[in-house]
């Protein structure tokens, strides 16, 4: 039976045919083995931290199994959310309800009936008991989406729950670190810590090579290497690009991945991503007040202010998700075409614009928080955003 490309390359679901196990550097210990060990340690909470789009949730699904994993998101919680009501609802337990009791009295000719309604709330002990009896593992994904106050409330609930042997995994990003978990004195000695590294190019190449082999599509090692560089350490992005390649090859009735198809596939892939507003917001910067912004002529003839230069610097080759300030500043200088007697912008000016841009993005919805300026480095928190920046803009 011929297998379809969408069954092989699955960007948003468990990749049965293209799952790649990864190992701690210089060891034969896989992430799967480490997670199994953590889950078998009674009374401990598992904390998984790693960059966005790195397969943290897929790792959990691989080890736990789709039938046993119960996923909730930090975004599910606000200050009015009942934690245990949410946990119960995910497994369809009736957390609150009413019980009607009826009483009958009968005489020779008449039967009387009366009754009363009683409200109940399921105890957390019963919820924990259900999870344990049914071998369920609670995975709180995107823990950083919850407010710091809510994170602390959840941490307090989990402290007692893990003592009762509820299995819980908390998943978060490294630069929005779950301090409520990892820095919580009440959880000291009760944590299994797992830090997920970014993907190496050799592991990303395996996704392409395995998948295309399954589909009987030819691809050279050199092409797979180019794909691995462009997918910016993200296995999810690799799945997206490979699926786009398959769609284009099928349309052209071809069975080989060539250099010519790559750029077309990159641009085709960005149709899936909605970052246009994010890019526009970054390029415009904060609302302008007072004097006009200084404009710089670029080597390709554009006129950009510092916010525009920041955006273009992110898009330059080679694609990087972590950029030191010196490298970032160098990229900006390379973009500017200086006229006579004109000087390059001071480093302090660039840093000030990065700080203001950071404040602007932090005040907006989560999708806008694609980059972070912290500790002298620019971090790209979302590889899909950077990929869009490089290939999705009409004038990019």
Predicted regions and their residues:
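A short, basic N-terminal segment
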Residues: 1-46
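Mid-core helix/loop region of P-loop NTP-binding domains shared across ATPases and GTPases
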Residues: 94-140, 144-167, 173-186, 197-203, ...
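Walker A/P-loop nucleotide-binding motif
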Residues: 39-61, 76
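C-terminal leucine-rich, beta-strand-based interaction scaffolds used for sensing/assembly
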Residues: 260-396
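Amphipathic alpha-helical "lid/sensor" segments that cap RecA-like P-loop NTPase cores
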Residues: 221-279, 396
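Conserved small helical "lid"/interfacial subdomain of P-loop NTPases
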Residues: 196-224, 233-241
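Conserved NTP-binding/hydrolysis module of P-loop NTPases
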Residues: 68-69, 78-109
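A short hydrophobic beta-strand->loop->alpha-helix junction that borders the nucleotide-binding pocket
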Residues: 49-50, 70-80, 173
């Amino acid at each position: 039976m011929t297998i379809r490309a969408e069954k092989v390359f699955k960007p948003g679901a468990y990749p049965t045919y293209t799952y790649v196990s990864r190992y701690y550097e210089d060891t034969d210990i896989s992430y799967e083995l480490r997670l199994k060990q953590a889950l078998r340690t009674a009374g401990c909470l598992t904390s998984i931290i790693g960059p966005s789009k790195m397969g943290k949730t897929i790792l959990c699904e691989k080890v736990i199994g789709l039938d046993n994993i119960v996923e909730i998101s930090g975004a599910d919680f606000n200050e009015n959310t009942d934690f245990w009501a949410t946990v119960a609802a995910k497994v369809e337990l009736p957390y609150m309800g009413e019980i009607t009791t009826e009483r009958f009295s009968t005489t020779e000719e008449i039967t009387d009936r009366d009754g009363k309604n009683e409200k109940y709330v399921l105890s957390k002990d019963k919820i924990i008991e259900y999870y344990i009896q049914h071998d369920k593992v609670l995975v709180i994904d995107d823990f950083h989406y919850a407010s710091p106050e809510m994170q602390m409330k959840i941490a307090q609930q989990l402290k007692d729950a893990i003592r009762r042997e509820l299995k819980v995994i908390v998943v978060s990003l490294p630069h929005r670190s779950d301090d409520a978990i990892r820095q919580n004195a009440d959880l000291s000695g009760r944590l299994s810590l797992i830090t997920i590294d970014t993907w190496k190019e050799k592991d990303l190449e395996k996704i392409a090579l395995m998948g295309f082999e399954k589909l009987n599509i030819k691809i050279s090692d050199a092409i797979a290497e180019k794909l691995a560089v462009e997918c910016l350490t993200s296995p999810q992005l690799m799945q997206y690009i490979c699926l786009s390649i398959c769609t284009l090859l099928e349309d052209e009735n071809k069975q080989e991945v060539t250099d010519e198809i790559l750029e077309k596939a990159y641009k085709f892939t960005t149709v899936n991503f909605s970052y246009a507003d994010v890019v526009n917001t970054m390029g415009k910067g904060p609302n302008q007040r007072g004097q006009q912004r200084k404009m710089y002529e670029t080597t390709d003839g554009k006129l950009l202010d510092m916010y525009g230069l920041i955006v273009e610097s992110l898009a330059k080759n080679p694609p990087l998700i972590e950029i030191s300030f010196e490298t970032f500043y160098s990229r900006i200088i390379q973009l500017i075409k200086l006229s006579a007697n004109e000087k390059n912008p001071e480093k302090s000016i660039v840093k000030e614009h990065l700080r203001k841009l950071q404040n602007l993005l932090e005040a907006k919805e989560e999708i806008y928080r694609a980059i972070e300026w912290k500790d002298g480095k620019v971090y790209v928190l979302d590889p899909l955003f950077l990929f869009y920046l490089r290939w999705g803009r009409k004038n990019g």
